[in-house]
Amino acid sequence: MKASEIRSAFLKFFESKGHQIVASSPVVPGDDPTLLFTNAGMNQFKDVFLGFDKRPYSRATTAQKCIRAGGKHNDLENVGYTARHHTFFEMLGNFSFGDYFKQDAIAYAWELLTEVFKLPKDKLWVTVYAEDDEAYEIWNKQVGVPAERIVRIGDNKGARYASDNFWMMGDTGPCGPCTEIFYDHGPEIPGGPPGSPDEDGDRYIEIWNNVFMQFNRDEAGVMHKLPKPSVDTGMGLERITAVLQHVHSNYEIDLFVALLAAAKQAVDAAGAGDSDKDSPSLKVIADHIRACSFTIVDGVIPGNEGRGYVLRRIARRGIRHGYKLGARKPFFHTLVAELVRQMGEAYPELARAEARVTEVLKQEEERFFQTIANGMEILESALAGGAKTLDGETAFKLHDTYGFPLDLTADVCRERGVTVDQAGFDAAMKRQREQARAAGKFKMAAGLEYAGAATTFHGYEHLVHEGSKVTAVYVDGSAVPSAKAGDDAVIVLDHTPFYAESGGQVGDGGELRNGTSRVIVEDTQKIQADVFGHHGRVVEGEIRVGDVLNARVDGEQRARTVRNHSVTHLMHKALREVLGGHVQQKGSLVNAERTRFDFAHNAPMSDAQIAKVEAIVNAEILANAPTQARVLPMEEAQKLGAMMLFGEKYGDEVRVLDIGSSRELCGGTHVQRTGDIGLFKVVAESGVAAGIRRVEAITGDNALAYVQQLEGTVAGLAGALKAAPAEVPGRVAAVLEQLRTLEKELAALKGKLASSQGDGLLAQAVDVKGLKVLAARLEGADAKALRDTLDQLKNKLKSAAIVLAVVEGGKVQLAAGVTADATARVKAGELVNFVAQQVGGKGGGKPDLAMAGGTDPAGLGAALASVAGWVGERA
């Protein structure tokens, strides 16, 4: 049976047992920002097991795409060097949500393995949790597995219920014993049965795990029986395929045989020649193309953090192993086509995204091959001395200057038996960060110590708060009892309507005052998570700790800022709609003037795409829908599908913002209705880093002023061209075409002028040791005419060294040429550099032709006069 047939047989078997076939969820969890990648079949059913979600079925079966390449589940370093480690794999599973339990689960597993897959019964071993007598009895008495092939596994991880055969979702919650099924590859393979001292050998291989969730563990560690126990099982498709195809390694199954052949062909074509078909590097490449492709399909692009970083690390590891085999140009992306042939039918989303996946990987390869070329040369040089440790400074230089990741350096070193000085690397990294902080913008939180009451924020509802008490005053970074007129101060209040900078939104400005004192607030930032510092200048009186002030936010500044913040949410949603679900926020800055939004995307936006985003957002604005903000438990926010950023730390309760069709977690301030935004206009789109784009946009009166300015510019052009505004593009195109024609005519005239001068220069050539030497200035020539005239003179003088110069706009252009028969004696590059240095410049080139420039025309005459002497010394 092929892998595809085994996958299908598994799903059809459980469908015949009343299970709903459920499609694989994406490898990127859509509702769990704490989970890097989907790493088990049960991930998509987590809320069902916890009781937060109800499904219309109580039995399910899946073939789940999984990735284990980061965090606790990280198999990356082993991939390619063992028979069964992968970054991407498929987990076949069957699930019972309070329906059947141990007896049926075990019976189904046995029936599938022995009757459908026809595995010999005497080749199968099982393990059970030591205290799970029920599972033991089912295996022994009902299924008929002999006692000598049933192994009880107790608490073997240093604590109660800490066992390979006891599964827990977390410190609390659903948990229970599990039973694992092993296949015996036979005595010719080293290794002992599970639970024995030699269990880590390859003879006995786990192929299926059945978890029986029958307890709920409370915070005290007490186990309470669940009223409706459930079943969660997982069987790796690659492992069971290896067993059924009678091969020992997963890399020998049909799916990998095809990918390995494609990998070898691609690597060989990229410069390897004839790579070793059994090389671990080919296995790395074949494995990694699966992980990379499915990750990109589900919306991730290579980056420097989170999932994007893991994707980049996997892709670059695969590329480097091709480089190790001899590949010297991009090859990795070409394997996507073969992967689609192998898995596109089972996962149609892969086939649909083939072109996009290929292009993303191609771009990453092109960037990384340049990085490899620079970094490997330095690393090889550092390792050539034979030291057993690579110093941290060198590792950091590779990382910081050449973009060579530390893990890649560690991979290369590990293969040479060399360790990396991690402590030295960390010290260099820390030093750089400290230097960057010292050179960066002052943040009021730096160095301000505060131990008073928290600040209560009232700014969602009000722009004014009366009766705010001063709890701390800082001047020049130090806590003081008071600040007087003229002081630049930071003032902490117990209650405030001022929004403190957070989530990309800048802090509010405004005014603090009482009967005798006044402070102009320029910025508001957080000293601590719940303590707001109001930074400004005392303009009247004196502000003391304990004073009571009235706090008033600058309403116009806030209104402009909230328009820009609210439109950022609508723009994010529109970008995902236009460009794809892979778009993810990477940074933002929202102030009163504009919004700046950085997001993951691997190509510049077209004018049509920008126009579509503008149309979608402005349609949302015209709908004038009300904005709703709610504080909800995190679990409820997840169920509502609120967008959240991976890697962000959220509390038990979160603020969910609904604006138009967007639903995100956000603590910022926003408009009451979408119509309050007024107008939305994108003013710039650019790239800020590999795989990161930036959009800048404006709203409201700023957008109106921008459009009016553009209209004024067009009107001015129309007047100059004596045309109607609608005719401006056509008129400009006609003028540009006329300009191009005139430029061609001018260039031709310059060429003729230079050529005519060249004929007159032949008589100026002097004989220097059998070589004709000519150094002269042309008038009215450009760079092309200079080169053309030089070529004509070389042809006519036969054996010569020539320097021609032209002065235009206060700058000197030089061209030097040496005929082929004389380049052994005189080099054009050296000659032109000699002349250029005398006119304030430098240059170089090939032995027969070289160009240079200079900034000092006054020295040109003497420089040209020195050419014959210079040639004479070398000829």
From Swiss-Prot:
Any Gene Ontology biological process: alanyl-tRNA aminoacylation
GO cellular component assignments: cytosol
InterPro entries found in the cross-reference section: aa-tRNA-synth_II/BPL/LPL (IPR045864), Ala-tRNA-lgiase_IIc (IPR002318), Ala-tRNA-ligase_IIc_anticod-bd (IPR018162), Ala-tRNA-synth_IIc_core (IPR018165), Ala-tRNA-synth_IIc_N (IPR018164), Ala-tRNA_ligase (IPR050058), Ala_tRNA_ligase_euk/bac (IPR023033), DHHA1_dom (IPR003156)
Top-level taxon: Bacteria
Entry keywords, A to Z: Aminoacyl-tRNA synthetase, ATP-binding, Cytoplasm, Ligase, Metal-binding, Nucleotide-binding, Protein biosynthesis, RNA-binding, tRNA-binding, Zinc
Cofactor details (free text): Binds 1 zinc ion per subunit.
Pfam name, any one: DHHA1
Cofactor(s) the record lists: Zn(2+)
Gene3D superfamilies listed in its UniProt record: 2.40.30.130, 3.10.310.40, 3.30.54.20, 6.10.250.550, Bira Bifunctional Protein, Domain 2 (3.30.930.10), Threonyl-trna Synthetase, Chain A, domain 2 (3.30.980.10)
Residue sites binding Zn(2+) per the record: 565, 569, 666, 670
Localization per record: Cytoplasm
SUPFAM superfamilies: Class II aaRS and biotin synthetases (SSF55681), Putative anticodon-binding domain of alanyl-tRNA synthetase (AlaRS) (SSF101353), ThrRS/AlaRS common domain (SSF55186), Translation proteins (SSF50447)
Enzymatic reactions: tRNA(Ala) + L-alanine + ATP = L-alanyl-tRNA(Ala) + AMP + diphosphate
One GO molecular-function entry: alanine-tRNA ligase activity
E.C. numbers: 6.1.1.7
Cited NCBIfam families: alaS
Protein function: Catalyzes the attachment of alanine to tRNA(Ala) in a two-step reaction: alanine is first activated by ATP to form Ala-AMP and then transferred to the acceptor end of tRNA(Ala). Also edits incorrectly charged Ser-tRNA(Ala) and Gly-tRNA(Ala) via its editing domain.
UniProt record similarity statement: Belongs to the class-II aminoacyl-tRNA synthetase family.
Domain notes: Consists of three domains; the N-terminal catalytic domain, the editing domain and the C-terminal C-Ala domain. The editing domain removes incorrectly charged amino acids, while the C-Ala domain, along with tRNA(Ala), serves as a bridge to cooperatively bring together the editing and aminoacylation centers thus stimulating deacylation of misacylated tRNAs.
Name of the protein this chain belongs to: Alanine--tRNA ligase
Protein source organism: Methylibium petroleiphilum (strain ATCC BAA-1232 / LMG 22953 / PM1)
